[in-house]
């Protein structure tokens, strides 16, 4: 499964003040609002900055700041860069349910199969979905993904 890489990066900034500070820095660097969350400049690269505990419309069950909910990538003098746990990455993508998001989730599942328990994923997804206004629709996304995973990964 090979496809061109996108030129964007999704960042979750849990602290509202830090989110505002980061937006200000991007504006100083010439970035302009490109969408509800996106900031871009003429090179086409987009930063999607999500505030608080939500990615797009997905409200995470727990704070990404909790140690078990992220992995440190790099710590700079004023920036802590971490990546969400695999479950929250997959859940936030499956809530959108696009083909590209499904491909991303399958790729992650294949690459990290020994670290991702499908029963845990399903339980966590169902709990997250129970708080969403479109619970039925997102549950269909999960069912579709599990069928794909059964065919392609398991």
Regions of interest found by a model, annotated:
Residues 1-154:
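Compositionally biased terminal segments of proteins
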């Amino acid at each position: 499964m090979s496809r061109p890489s996108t030129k964007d990066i999704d960042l979750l900034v849990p602290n509202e003040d830090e989110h505002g500070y980061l937006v200000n820095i991007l504006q100083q660097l010439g970035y302009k609002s490109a969408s509800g969350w996106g900031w871009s400049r003429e090179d086409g690269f987009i930063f999607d900055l999500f505030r608080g505990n939500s990615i797009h419309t997905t409200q995470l069950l727990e704070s990404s700041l909790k140690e078990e909910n992220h992995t440190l990538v790099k710590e700079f003098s004023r920036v802590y860069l971490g990546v969400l746990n695999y479950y929250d990455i997959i859940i936030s993508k499956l809530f959108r349910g696009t083909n590209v998001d499904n491909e991303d989730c399958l790729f992650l599942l294949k690459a990290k199969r020994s670290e991702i328990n499908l029963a845990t994923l399903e339980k966590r997804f169902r709990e997250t979905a129970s708080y969403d206004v479109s619970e039925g629709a997102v549950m269909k996304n999960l069912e579709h993904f599990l069928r794909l995973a059964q065919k392609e990964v398991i």
